[in-house]
Amino acid sequence: MTYPGLAALSGPAAALLIANRQTVSVAESSCGGLISAALVAVPGASAFYIGGGIIYTAQGGRALLPERPKGMKSATQEFALFEARSIREKMGTIWGIGETGASGPSGNPYGNPPGHAVVAVSGPIERAIILATGRADREANMWAFAKAALDLLAELAAQSAK
């Protein structure tokens, strides 16, 4: 399978962030840094990309995020929004992206099948969406999750600019 270039993946979102002088930070999990890599691949990324972290394990989450509310489960819309809001607040950005899921080839410890992910964007507008690719292909899922997160950022950044 072939994948788009990293800059092409984030191009629409990056163009909107640059045009609107807005910033973004990322807390990602099953994408393993692919969302951040796509944003940084755009020339001039330092104008809009502030930073991020890979929250791959509970230990990583404890190090990078505030304590999550009791009863909040990973790989849910609630948790993805928690990631997005937390990283946005921690980094002082206009937008925050949160991503959590199961890239494959098997499910995650929370009972989600491979290909399940939740991406969220928090900022002037916020939304979380659930993805279900139905595939166990780890790399293909990582690209699909990253594309969904960056497409959601572009959609919300465009809406907020109106």
Predicted regions: what they are:
Residues 1-162:
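Short alpha-helical segments enriched in small residues
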